[in-house]
Swiss-Prot record:
Pfam annotation, one family: Tyr_Deacylase
Biological process per Gene Ontology, one example term: D-amino acid catabolic process
Matching PANTHER family: D-AMINOACYL-TRNA DEACYLASE 1, D-TYROSYL-TRNA TYR DEACYLASE
Quaternary structure (record): Homodimer.
Sequence motif Gly-cisPro motif, important for rejection of L-amino acids, residues: 137-138
Source organism (scientific name): Listeria monocytogenes serotype 4a (strain HCC23)
Principal subcellular localisation of the protein: cytoplasm
Keyword vocabulary terms for this entry: Cytoplasm, Hydrolase, RNA-binding, tRNA-binding
Record remark on domains: A Gly-cisPro motif from one monomer fits into the active site of the other monomer to allow specific chiral rejection of L-amino acids.
tRNA-binding listed as a keyword: yes
Record's subcellular location: Cytoplasm
Record protein name field: D-aminoacyl-tRNA deacylase
Gene3D superfamilies given in the database record: D-tyrosyl-tRNA(Tyr) deacylase
Length: 151
């Protein structure tokens, strides 16, 4: 599982030029799944994200998590996070989980985030979406469950 996390002042997602979800501040997550991801992977990543200390305290040190300060998450599915561009000029997406599996894991991931007390807004799984993000920092972090668990 890969999540591109972006701390933001605001974020929104539109489908066919209609805003379907938006947040006033917190985190925008672009979320992708691969074949080996499981519900346990989703649980691990949700807990990691909610607890990441990426907001500044009064000393301007990143020491506060979203769970500590409040805020919201805009979660957007993005199979292209598993693009393989090692051969040729066209990306291959064979490392991305099949749609049915990815959608089930995406729904579970969003539920786990919401269960932690965070407001979660989402895009539309599988849709062509326009995502607008006003980054704060900018703070952008790539989380890869395979890399994180191997350490």
């Amino acid at each position: 599982m890969r999540v591109l996390l972006q701390r933001c002042y605001e974020a929104s997602v539109s489908v066919e030029e209609e805003v379907i979800s938006e947040i006033a501040g917190g985190l925008c997550l672009l979320v992708g799944f691969t074949h080996t991801d499981t519900p346990e992977t989703v649980d691990y990543m949700a807990k990691k994200i909610v607890g990441l200390r990426i907001f500044e305290d009064e000393s301007e040190k990143m020491n506060i998590s979203l769970a500590d300060r409040g805020g919201a998450i805009l979660s957007v599915s993005q199979f292209t996070l598993y693009a393989d561009v090692s051969k040729g000029k066209r990306p291959s997406f064979t490392k991305s989980a099949p749609g049915e599996k990815a959608e089930a894991l995406y729904d579970l991931f969003n539920q786990k985030l919401a269960d932690s007390g965070i407001i979660v807004e989402t895009g539309v799984f599988g849709a062509m979406m326009d995502v607008k993000i006003v980054n704060h920092g900018p703070i952008t972090i790539m989380l890869d469950s395979d890399e994180m668990r191997s350490k």
